[in-house]
């Protein structure tokens, strides 16, 4: 039987989580898929390209598209990310507006909703109140009412915690009901359509972002140079990658005193890389300065933006 053979009434489609930076979109994507496919960090604007996570159910296949958060851009990179996001919205079967339970709805949320309605005026909307584990029941109730009022019409609103799993299955049931009937788009063993190098570079970037403050996180980009069998150790893969920053001072911060921070980056990234490659890994990281790459069209193209 082909993976495209589906029972009568089977539903499938693409849903995008939309919201301000740091509303928990990537964490929720991982929770629904059941495996880590999107990196997470305490800094806003971590996601840099649409990541498709695939949820398999007996009655549906849900493709969750985790996009960069819509924001008012300060760099050419920011402008390009916003364009990617808007193009993604136009192709969705369902768009979910996400707001955290522990932060009041404000002008930023309204700006995002207006942007979504301009790009995808006919696409159904779903409201999701995230991070309910961080708020009281009364706070969650107020947020649900305010989000319902913001969306207007007959849009449904669902509370969820990606951390505890509370309401996860309820949310999947609601999403399934709102998707159209259709075929499977991916085989049952696929959880994402990201290529291996992209997943590895994102894991390294996540490890590099840990503990960073101010503007430095936005200046970090990662590129995989090559993945090769180790010449001397059987069953070991050598992963060679470059971390790019914009200034020499940023390079010094990432290397750390006596190379300690760089060592932590390697230590933290290796376990997830080993999971993906299914092999022991020697991770070789170099840090290079690529001056003002966020504003340079040529360098943005080289880095895949």
Swiss-Prot record:
The keyword Zinc-finger does not apply. Residues 66-69 are annotated as: G3. Residues 160-162 are annotated as: G5. It is a peripheral membrane protein. Residues 11-181 form the Era-type G domain. It comes from the Bacteria. The keyword Membrane applies. Gene3D superfamilies: 3.30.300.20, P-loop containing nucleotide triphosphate hydrolases. One of its GO terms (molecular function) is small ribosomal subunit rRNA binding. It is found in: Cytoplasm; Cell membrane. GO terms for cellular component: cytosol; plasma membrane. InterPro entries: G_ERA_dom, GTP-bd, GTPase_Era-like, KH_dom-like_a/b, KH_dom_type_2, KH_sf_prok-type, P-loop_NTPase, Small_GTP-bd. Residues 45-49 are annotated as: G2. Residues 130-133 are annotated as: G4. Pfam families: KH_2, MMR_HSR1. Monomer. HAMAP family: GTPase_Era (MF_00367). This is GTPase Era. It comes from Corynebacterium diphtheriae (strain ATCC 700971 / NCTC 13129 / Biotype gravis).
